[in-house]
Amino acid sequence: MLFKSLAGLALAAAAVAKDVTYYWDIGYVTANPDGKLERQVIGVNGVWPPPPLHVSLNDTLVIETRNSLDTPTTLHAHGMYQNGTNYMDGPYMVTQCGIPPGGNMTYRIPIIQTGTYWIHAHFSAQYVDGIRAPLILHNPEEPHKYDEDVVLTLEDWYHDGAAGLLKDFLSWKNPGGAEPVPNGALIGRVGGDELYKLKFTPGKTYRIRLINMSALSMFHFSIEGHKMRVIEVDGVDTEEQEVGNVILSVAQRTSIL
């Protein structure tokens, strides 16, 4: 009877799990997110910014990837364990060869975690050119109570391309190893004179998923006149903790209510 019950549970879990498939054609586009300079960036399917990816616990994230760049590329799901699937982790020449120009690769990642993550290129300094996007792993049995779910990205932005920035950083003319200073910051993928707007309805509780997708910069986040409650840090649910502001270093994620 016990084995029949366990088998039934396994079949039930298998029945609800599914493949969630995205098609990413990675290529060059032009964008001007801070309103200061239009330049070549790396987008997906002919647009920038790349759209967020959403998948649920026990599903499998599938990314059908085509490289339309003139250099290799890879994709890395930041913060994911990749237990048994390290060959899908993405670091160039560490866990995989690069996807060559004109080449294709299918990433298949079983989802055994929940929370807030992000995905980015992991070849050279490529993600500085914009190939980065939120990756949200939903929990069907979400322990925290809220009415709406909002993703808010924070990132620095350079007017020079990643290849030139990396060349200058590694140059003998930079003996102190000074890192390139960004030209500005983007909140919600916009910056400069354009402000990202969040619309709230009084009486509703909002989960804001903060993701620092920068190359260099730390962000201090606060909402004037409001306290916030931290409920998740780097994909790990926490007991609610009231704070006045949140500090996020590069690659960190925090959810607040």
Feature names for model-found ranges:
Residues 1-17:
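Fungal secretory targeting signals
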Residues 8, 15, 178, 182-184, ...:
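N-terminal processing/targeting junctions
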Residues 20-142, 217-246:
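Histidine- and aromatic-enriched segments that form or immediately flank copper-ligand environments
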Residues 115-117, 206, 254:
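Exposed beta-strand face motif in extracellular beta-rich ectodomains
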Residues 130, 146-149:
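Short coil/turn connectors at secondary-structure junctions
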Residues 148-205, 209-215:
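Acidic-aromatic/histidine active-site loop/patch
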Residues 211, 255-257:
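A conserved active-site cap/scaffold subdomain adjacent to cofactor or substrate pockets
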Residues 251:
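Ligand-binding face of N-terminal immunoglobulin V-set domains in extracellular IgSF glycoproteins
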